[in-house]
Amino acid sequence: MAENLLPRGDDLAQQENNGFGPLFKRRGRTAAITSAIIGVSSGAMLFLAVKEEEKKTHFLVFTAALLTLSFAFGELLRRLSLVSEEIQHKHTRHQGKWKSVFKTTFTFDHGGCISLTAMFSALILCYQLYEQYEVFSRSDFAILFSVNCLVVPQLLFLVGLRQLSPVETSDLNEKENKNVADGLAWSYYFGYLKLVLPHLKDQIAKSEQFRYKIKKKKLFILLPKTCFTHADIVDADPRVKWAGNLPELKISRGGIKDRIYKHAVHKIEMPRPDGTMDEYHFILEYATSLMTLYDMSQHADAPLSRKERDHQVVLFIRKLREILDKSEECRGSYELVPISGNDPNEIANVLVGMHNAANIEVLAGNHDQANGVIRPE
């Protein structure tokens, strides 16, 4: 007897965004906050454990300052090994400038904070040595400082413990726009969307064929998770048929006089219960930049795994949304439509669903306005 199983949480998550799946957000400050909590709580527990004994308290403070200062100096010495490598590339990477060699090697994101911590540690050491010179001037502490400054940083570097984890690398790339997806999103915006979207409503108004048929005067951009874009959308969903093009938009760009840009209008027919048909017209196209990700995943010289491609397509959508949300020229002229790319009948259903949902929202807003109702944001 077949069992009726409820969908699991993972299955429900994969149904989000028209079957595309969840779109993750930027990483926050949780890791830094957790690290701070661990550091402060550990230091507090150590201090509470020795606070009754003055000698141990002084030892704890002195040792913490000593290790902190030795770590700072050790990092500077470790970076000298990086300088030795950069010297080999001084003329090709740094235009022969020593200043560039040292600047790129010894630059810290939080240099001010590091300097302040090192100075504070040095002051503590000086004070402790002044107060209890006989206790802390032993050679044991000098050896500890030397090992932690000269040996440990180099050892950690050589065995690979200083290598960034995949999480840290991903976070760094996202923050500094170094992902493939970030470059593709910016290129798609500057090379296409920023040029055509500001003129979209004018192009619709110029079209005698479609000016009254197109109800949603936006460019609907299909974003399949598979990254594969069909040459004709009808191949992805037979119900989405090409109906014609809007008037051509001519823009001189990149040395090409009157380069032509044009948008395709697609028609969807959905049957009613009484047998008649509802017609919907959309300005519809794929985000062609996604095909680059698909091609990279298929090319031997540009290895991009399926898992990494799935990651990059989400980054592309997120970055593109961030860019367009901040663009005054493009506001109100686009609709991003993430889809799974696997269902042959999903495009028509998704677009009609978005169209009807928008109409219901407008009708609800008009009804509230007529009755003096103010909905909370």
UniProtKB/Swiss-Prot annotation:
InterPro entries: STING (IPR029158), STING_C_sf (IPR038623), STING_LBD (IPR055432), STING_TM (IPR055434). Pfam families: STING_LBD (PF15009), STING_TM (PF23417). Keywords: Immunity, Innate immunity, Membrane, Transmembrane, Transmembrane helix. Gene3D superfamilies: 1.20.5.5200, Stimulator of interferon genes protein. It is a multi-pass membrane protein. GO terms for biological process: activation of innate immune response; autophagosome assembly; innate immune response; positive regulation of macroautophagy; positive regulation of type I interferon production; reticulophagy. It is found in: Membrane. The chain crosses the membrane at residues 30-50, 57-77, 106-126, 141-161. Its main location: membrane. GO terms for molecular function: 2',3'-cyclic GMP-AMP binding; 3',3'-cyclic GMP-AMP binding; cyclic-di-GMP binding. One of its GO terms (cellular component) is autophagosome. PANTHER family: STIMULATOR OF INTERFERON GENES PROTEIN. Belongs to the STING family. Facilitator of innate immune signaling that acts as a sensor of second messenger signals produced by cyclic GMP-AMP synthase-like receptors (cGLRs) and promotes the production of type I interferon. Innate immune response is triggered in response to nucleotides from viruses and bacteria delivered to the cytoplasm. This is Stimulator of interferon genes protein 7. The gene is STING7.
